[in-house]
From Swiss-Prot:
This is Meiotically up-regulated gene 100 protein, mitochondrial. It is found in: Mitochondrion inner membrane. GO terms for biological process: meiotic cell cycle. Keywords: Meiosis, Membrane, Mitochondrion, Mitochondrion inner membrane, Transit peptide, Transmembrane, Transmembrane helix. The chain crosses the membrane at residues 147-167, 178-198. It comes from the Eukaryota. GO terms for cellular component: mitochondrial inner membrane; mitochondrion. It is a multi-pass membrane protein. Has a role in meiosis. The gene is mug100.
Amino acid sequence: MYTTKRFQQLLKEFEVALLLKFSKQLLLLGKIESYLNNGSSMKHEECKSQIYDCRMAVKIYVCSITANKSTNLKHFVRLFFLLGDSERVNLCIKRLIYTFIGSINSVIDKKEDIEQELYSSCMHCSIMSPKLQKVMLAQKSLILNKVFDYLFFLYGLSGTSILYTAGDHIRKLDFKDSGFITPFFQLLLLVLLFTLTFKSKHSLNAYSLTASQFSGHTVCNESSLKPNENSCDLNLSRTATIKLESAEDDACQRVLGLIKSYMRPRTLEELKLEFRFEHKSVQDITTCILDEVDGVQMARVLEINPDAPILAF
């Protein structure tokens, strides 16, 4: 069984390694494009002097996309081991992992064509052919898709705080020589990340939780179900009592979402969750929670990340 601290450390390694790889790939593509686009206007000797640099950039790039496969698989294998045996790993998380690996493999499958085209262009100091331009554009698109797949993968595991960290890394990257990501595009990327973070924290904040709130016995009141008002502290270590003074149409789904997202990977019986309500109208919430959690075995989910400053949904 993994420890939360070890799990967070793994995610941090994963985040830094991959985001830097993606940024380097984009920078290399920009450098290669610069060599090829400038080659036609150079004198022959000037061009020859850059052939080696151009080919080295191609080689590093191809090695980079090849290395991504083994690097990512290594991290994912470690992630599986830390999460526990296969029966205890949430099926949704597994799907995310396999989807992410698939997006990486889609880049690797094209590496032979990329290498051949780029090497040929380097040697002849020629500008990129229409075919090569399409290949380069496709590569950039795939890399950016990987970045977003990766961010949302981590977002699903660690909550909104991962977007702050990823945003910090992106903000520190230097894309001025990439020939592709302009400062304006970089700004748009950051705006998107923080917009997603803001939305997840404010438009869906039926509950706002911090790690320090996961202790002692807690009772949630009516205000906890109303967005943009007081947060609700829940203790999910062994027993949780939820006291609702009134019900809303989506109250069941929000309570269920909390349990599915932040419960330790134990069965519902082991947790001995207890639900108490003030009004008869909310008795349906109890049925919804028990049926859905137990029916699809969603009681086995990830432990809350104690290092996140705030988690909301």
